């Protein structure tokens, strides 16, 4: 009897343990183990803005719960807040993800710096918090030379590169004297020296507008690109998320065009014949590896007659190893039909040929080979590099160059590559005029909320032919033109207009740090990704990640999409600024314009730091 009585007492305990186990398993499956690690549930948010007390606390809980149902999904009243250590999260360039997923990558090929996006179950569906004490960024043009230290609390480069004048910490700010590894005395003097080497008029590197788009590989904090802006040269400053700690984040905080990327195994997200000049100042790249594949990738993106400016010990040092590298590089570029345009002191500038004549005149079996005729040089998203030379089109060969007008006429001149899409000059001109009118409308709606210097970094999430960016020419802004990878690859038209951008899939996160853009333009992009079966909610969270606090989003989409976005405003801490129906004369007259502003909010930990 005694044993049976004790067994009877144990049964309820066992049942309770089983029920508790089931509940825990359900919670684990619902929230996802990887997401839970990144989130502190129930944290408080402090909301603030330019007109608010930044230390005012809000009672909004960051724990997730459902307000109502939209279609087959849920609309949250609030999103959880990511842990503070994720304040600089770049989902597709997250080394913690690489470790957790045990990806087998070849470090010697820089694969660990390439894009590796999380599967849906590993996404951090939470709001990225700003760092403690975050301030609205300093406005352009002052931002070129100084940023708030609290916004990017990384001073490693200031100490490591102290002898090269990259950056200097001064009180609450980080200053940028304009130095670099091979231009300690200033990027402006270095740029003028390069122009002088090429005998360009007045030592101006744009050569009367003939040179407009540059690529700076291993750009550091992008002072080279920042100082080129004064010469009306647009530079895509490129560097990986590596041990140099946040160099691209500094560049974007300064208001300088920049992109996180690496010369590894995949093609750069730019079409062929995009840049007039590529630049490498001691970028520590082994150009001879894998049959010169990295140099051939630069060759692919350079225009006919384009330049490669190379400042490195190999160009001038006399020790045995540097001399060996110089001999082998010289032989390689010679077989690629490059010639030396100028060489002085520490810098050599090579030039590509203007036509296919040299390529076709090489001896049979010469390496590197010409690319196969069926190889598309403009296919770039997730495409492996090829160790071959891309020939010019018949048009470029016959015209002995790209046939582009000098800047600024280039912006509104029909690009020669329009014919690749079957677009006429009339279509191009109508598109340019349509977006001029639309941008005028946008600025009329925004003007009560912004000053002339409020906006600097802009992203057009579906850029088409780049006419949105073209309409902003007279404003002191720059535009990252994004062309979705599943549509017409019109990015080459954008580069031919003297603008810049990248190919991307909005089903994935963009290669940039959080809080790097002042304004996002979302034309039909939410509708498009829903058609692809991707998550509109994920896209909205990604837009929030890359938008600066107090920044704006211009949404131009169908009424149903605008209604959906409005349901997320509170959860995302966005505020609707203006709503307007498109003009009846507009070709997208069924579109609705919604302008939202991201509020500045701080976590409770940040607020305590301010007290």
UniProtKB/Swiss-Prot annotation:
Glycans are attached at residue 345. Its EC number is 2.1.1.-. InterPro entries: Put_SAM_MeTrfase, SAM-dependent_MTases_sf. Residues 1-11 are cytoplasmic. GO terms for molecular function: methyltransferase activity. It is a single-pass type II membrane protein. It is an enzyme of class 2 (transferase). The chain crosses the membrane at residues 12-32. Residues 33-611 are lumenal. GO terms for cellular component: endosome; Golgi apparatus; Golgi medial cisterna; Golgi membrane; nucleus; plant-type vacuole; trans-Golgi network. GO terms for biological process: methylation. It is found in: Golgi apparatus membrane. It comes from the Eukaryota. This is Probable methyltransferase PMT1. It comes from Arabidopsis thaliana (Mouse-ear cress).
């Amino acid at each position: 009897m005694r044993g049976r009585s004790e067994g009877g007492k144990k049964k309820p305990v066992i049942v309770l343990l089983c029920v508790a186990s089931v509940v825990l398993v359900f919670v684990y499956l619902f929230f996802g183990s990887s997401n839970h690690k990144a989130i502190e549930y129930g944290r408080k948010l402090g909301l603030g803005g330019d007109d608010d007390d930044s230390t005012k606390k809000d009672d909004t809980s960051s724990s997730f719960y459902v307000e109502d149902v939209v279609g087959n999904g849920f609309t949250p009243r609030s999103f959880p807040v990511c842990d503070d250590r994720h304040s600089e999260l770049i989902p597709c360039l997250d080394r913690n993800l690489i470790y957790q997923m045990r990806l087998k990558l070849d470090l010697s090929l820089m694969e660990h710096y390439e894009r590796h996006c999380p599967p849906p179950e590993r996404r951090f569906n939470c709001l990225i918090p700003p760092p403690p004490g975050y301030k609205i960024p300093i406005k352009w043009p002052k931002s070129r030379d100084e940023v708030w230290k609290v916004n990017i609390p990384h001073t490693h480069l200031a100490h490591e590169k102290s002898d090269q004048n990259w950056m200097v910490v001064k009180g609450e700010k980080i200053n940028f004297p304009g130095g670099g590894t091979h231009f300690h005395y200033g990027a402006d003097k270095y740029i003028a020296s390069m122009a002088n080497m090429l005998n360009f008029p007045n030592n101006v590197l744009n050569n009367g507008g003939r040179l407009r788009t540059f690529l700076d590989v291993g750009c550091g904090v992008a002072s080279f690109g920042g100082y080129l802006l004064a010469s009306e040269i647009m530079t895509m400053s490129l560097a990986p998320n590596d041990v140099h700690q946040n160099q691209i984040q500094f560049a974007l905080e300064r208001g300088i065009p920049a992109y996180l990327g690496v010369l590894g195994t995949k093609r750069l997200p730019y079409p062929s014949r995009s840049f007039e000049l590529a630049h490498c100042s001691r970028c520590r790249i082994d150009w001879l590896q894998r049959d010169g594949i990295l140099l051939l990738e630069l060759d692919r993106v350079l225009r006919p007659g384009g330049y490669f400016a190379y400042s490195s010990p190999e160009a001038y040092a006399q020790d045995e190893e540097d001399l060996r590298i110089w001999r082998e590089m010289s032989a390689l570029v010679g077989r690629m039909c490059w010639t030396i345009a100028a060489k002085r002191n520490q810098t050599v500038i090579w030039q590509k040929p203007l036509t296919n004549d040299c390529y076709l005149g090489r001896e049979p079996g010469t390496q590197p080979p010409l690319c196969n005729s069926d190889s598309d040089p403009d296919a770039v998203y997730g495409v492996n590099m090829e160790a071959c030379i891309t020939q010019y089109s018949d048009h470029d060969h016959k015209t002995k160059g790209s046939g582009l007008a000098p800047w600024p006429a280039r912006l509104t001149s029909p690009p020669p590559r329009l014919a690749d899409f079957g677009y006429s000059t009339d279509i191009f001109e109508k598109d340019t005029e349509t977006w001029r009118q639309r941008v005028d409308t946008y600025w009329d709606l925004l003007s009560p909320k912004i000053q002339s210097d409020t906006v600097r970094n802009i992203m057009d999430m579906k850029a088409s032919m780049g006419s949105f960016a073209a309409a902003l020419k007279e404003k002191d802004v720059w535009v990252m033109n994004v062309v979705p990878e599943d549509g017409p690859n019109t990015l080459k038209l954008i580069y031919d207009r003297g603008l810049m951008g990248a190919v991307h899939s909005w089903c994935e996160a963009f290669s940039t740090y959080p809080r790097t853009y002042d304004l996002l333009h979302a034309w039909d992009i939410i509708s498009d990704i829903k058609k692809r079966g991707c998550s509109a909610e994920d896209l909205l969270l990604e837009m929030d990640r890359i938008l600066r606090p107090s920044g704006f989003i211009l949404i131009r989409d169908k009424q149903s999409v605008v209604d959906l976005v409005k349901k997320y405003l509170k959860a995302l801490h966005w505020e609707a600024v203006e709503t307007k129906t498109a003009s009846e004369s507009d070709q997208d007259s069924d579109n609705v314009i919604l302008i939202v502003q991201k509020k500045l909010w701080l976590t409770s930990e940040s607020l305590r730091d301010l007290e």
